[in-house]
């Protein structure tokens, strides 16, 4: 080995040049479509926007969407097809920054900047900032880093003008998707100041009196994602109205509860005045309403917020009567299970703040309260922070399992999934109705109801059904996306941030791992959803409630994530999905033996951990093969059907012929000596009645 080769090895014996090739494999990959302005994104885990085909009028995700909307050189899953370097360079001129519709040319750039890659020597290049992304480009080595500004959690200056150490003066960018990026600037020229100012301005638009980039981004998708979900249509799909449940529009104009949808299902016996009283007894006015009804037993899942019983144990007769209506609506069981997502100690502590939980005694043993021990948003936020430190940038092989265990992330995933399964057992096994709530009913409650519905109803395991599930249980019922994920706000230490929705998607992935053919969508679909949870490219996850999205006119002014997904469905379909009748209700095993860390998502920025398989490309190839095989099977079935029909006709003709022949003999016997007018024996027979 010569000296140059020796220098390329790190302490662990890993070839740095090979690692850089892995990180910049985007130069040898191309994601089935062109990037912005017909230009592909060259980073195989690159920026999270739709890549635009201006000729076809469609948008397909580049690797940015396939492995993540926020992307980096360290790449995520390897999701691209392949093209040689010459083709890539023809499609991506290195003297330009690829732009999305509505994205402005670089507002600021700085040359001679070094990206301090944790897996390679510093890479020198040029950094650009647009109104949507941070874009770093190096020619030698050929390398691109493309990160949507919405994914940034905080931006900090490192070092001072007096700093003498090399690469000690620059900017650190900490992202919401488990990674951090560092750039070293030259001290002369004040390039750091200008880049920092523009990056801060557009990464945190609400803090700088600007709108989200989603209001600038316009693309003519083939599908209208905003039309995926209609509240009344979904309730009718579930069978409403019935004798015991009705579709209620009492919340028109969001007068009853400003974090609920305008339309929801309530017991038929509950009139509108009762709804007002019950809403007044529930936190935030979030009264019990229908999430799902069993098509056969009519057992239901309803959701709400905690009752306002306080330390004095207040009662509300209308609320008690309302819950009795929910019980009585289910003729197969007279018992209502109240699933409180919180640990008991937390529920008791909430009494001091005016909240609390239901008293079983007032329901004459017809209600049972069960505490599911799911911890609050603060515990979950800290757990994810610890996990991010374990996964990026350095991984300790000798302590990997213990480090992951110490984050307690998988413990929380097990607990959430276990709670959802308990709901499923009560609804499906015991045929009983279940009421679910936590404190305010928009975090843990959404996790539990949506997961239980996913396990109970095969419709929600289809590509569009899962979109309906998210729109219904998360968006319309007021999960606070803006607050929980810090959209557009420069306040990374906000204690109200928490990965609640991320945990739901993680739980979905866990179930997919146990039932490979039960889901129409694939893992890439889940990663894409999480990437655009942060990207601010689409209006789907903006703001805290349906009411605010309506006030901001989000449906008219922004694109829906589902528009992009449904216009490029092949990227998100599971080739193993079986459409023939199968087990309708899923019962996954929520134990540590079966629950795994989702490395494709949490570890994708670490080249030592990410999958080297071209999963999306393989999935599309399998879909094509499946369609070919399905076509062959359909043709074979048609041919068999035709042959069977011909055989049946032939047998029928043969039978008729034999019958006619036998009938003719009888006629001849009965008319022996008879002859035709021509003197010949007659061969004409009377019709045979069969």
Q: Model features per residue range: what roles?
A:
Residues 1-2, 80, 179, 497:
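Short intrinsically disordered, low-complexity coil segments enriched in acidic
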Residues 130, 175-177:
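Acidic/polar residues in short coil/turn loops that connect beta-strands
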Residues 2, 7-43, 48, 52-128:
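Anionic N-terminal interaction surfaces
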Residues 120, 145-148, 159-171, 179-424, ...:
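Conserved N-terminal structural segment that caps and organizes enzyme catalytic cores in eukaryotes
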Residues 108, 114-170:
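Phosphoinositide-binding peripheral membrane targeting modules
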Residues 302, 427, 431-454, 508:
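A phosphate-binding catalytic loop at a beta-strand-loop-alpha-helix junction
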Residues 447-468:
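Catalytic activation segment of kinase domains across protein kinase-like and atypical kinase folds
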